[in-house]
């Protein structure tokens, strides 16, 4: 399983798209800020084993895709940029699917992998609850856009770490 340079370029492009999706000055939204507790698994990949890292990356990208693919999302963003972001996230997921398949086949019920994944799911569940509580307001979406930039930036850092270790995720 190899994450190509194209995969890494796609990750950077997704960050650029998120930056371009900015519609509001962040100042009026400052009172809506919340610490969602970005999971350390997404930030500090050195504590993860190979199969955990792949699973965490996949789950984070899947949850991010799901977040921007909900009905309320299309009302908040430029449709073209949103579609490009979702397409880019989908491509990254497909790239990781090639890595995830063998890992899942080896230890499908491995609870060591489930802890970090559940942490990522809880993180995104908190984001969905926040959006609902804020009635999917423009400010709430702006807060989430910035949060997703942090999350995707962290995932890109983790992907770079994995790639530097020989470029082959299976050799970690």
UniProtKB/Swiss-Prot annotation:
GO-annotated biological processes: adaptive immune response; B cell activation involved in immune response; defense response to virus; female pregnancy; humoral immune response; natural killer cell activation involved in immune response; positive regulation of biosynthetic process; response to exogenous dsRNA
Q: Which UniProt keywords are present, listed alphabetically? A: Antiviral defense, Cytokine, Disulfide bond, Glycoprotein, Hormone, Pregnancy, Secreted
Q: Does the keyword Secreted apply?
A: yes
**Signal peptide span per the entry?**
none
The family database entries (Gene3D superfamilies) matched by this protein are listed as: 1.20.1250.10
Tissue specificity annotation: Constitutively and exclusively expressed in the mononuclear cells of the extraembryonic trophectoderm.
Report the locations given in the UniProt record: Secreted
Q: What does this chain do?
A: Paracrine hormone primarily responsible for maternal recognition of pregnancy. Interacts with endometrial receptors, probably type I interferon receptors, and blocks estrogen receptor expression, preventing the estrogen-induced increase in oxytocin receptor expression in the endometrium. This results in the suppression of the pulsatile endometrial release of the luteolytic hormone prostaglandin F2-alpha, hindering the regression of the corpus luteum (luteolysis) and therefore a return to ovarian cyclicity.
* Further details from the record: IFN-tau genes are intronless. They evolved from IFN-omega genes in the ruminantia suborder and have continued to duplicate independently in different lineages of the ruminantia. They code for proteins very similar in sequence but with different biological potency and pattern of expression.
Q: What is this protein called?
A: Interferon tau-3
